[in-house]
Amino acid sequence: MKLAELSKEEIQELSMVEVAYLVMKETKEPFNYQDLLKKVAELKGMSEEQMLDRIGYLYTDLNIDGRFVTLGDNRWGLRSWYPLEQVEEEITGPTKKKAKAKAEEEVDELDENIEVFDDEFEDLEDELDELAESEDSDEEDEEFDEGDDIDELDDEFEESDDDL
């Protein structure tokens, strides 16, 4: 089926995605989405307002319909034109090294902050351990001095046992 063979009424009855398919099939070249939308709207005799109202519908239909493939940069083509490997290659664009480098710098900065935090945390732990050890040794010193006579303490315990 060719667009030239169809009457205005038949084109009106076709969906936008069907008209887009016929346009691409006849021209045999990929389209920028905006250009494709304008061409479809022109063929269907749509007003500017109608076209803007349906802009998202055509885009959604192109994504869902297995006959179309996005080529990147908002360009669309027919899947039948491209072998699978070529489509994957075209879709994969050049990597942006600046953004990646900036992201790596941010990660490095975060790693440094974590290391500083870990060091501060370890220092705080060490201080708390030392403080706890010194308090423990102070309590032990108060409980029993070597000068205390063990016999006196035994006598005190025996007296308290007798009271029970």
Curated annotation (Swiss-Prot):
Keywords: DNA-directed RNA polymerase, Nucleotidyltransferase, Transcription, Transferase. GO terms for biological process: DNA-templated transcription; regulation of DNA-templated transcription. Pfam families: HARE-HTH. Residues 93-164 are annotated as: Disordered. Residues 105-164 have a biased composition (Acidic residues). Residues 14-81 form the HTH HARE-type domain. The keyword Transferase applies. One of its GO terms (molecular function) is DNA-directed RNA polymerase activity. The keyword Nucleotidyltransferase applies. PROSITE patterns: HTH_HARE. One of its GO terms (cellular component) is DNA-directed RNA polymerase complex. RNAP is composed of a core of 2 alpha, a beta and a beta' subunits. The core is associated with a delta subunit and one of several sigma factors. Belongs to the RpoE family. Participates in both the initiation and recycling phases of transcription. In the presence of the delta subunit, RNAP displays an increased specificity of transcription, a decreased affinity for nucleic acids, and an increased efficiency of RNA synthesis because of enhanced recycling. This is Probable DNA-directed RNA polymerase subunit delta. It comes from Halalkalibacterium halodurans (strain ATCC BAA-125 / DSM 18197 / FERM 7344 / JCM 9153 / C-125).
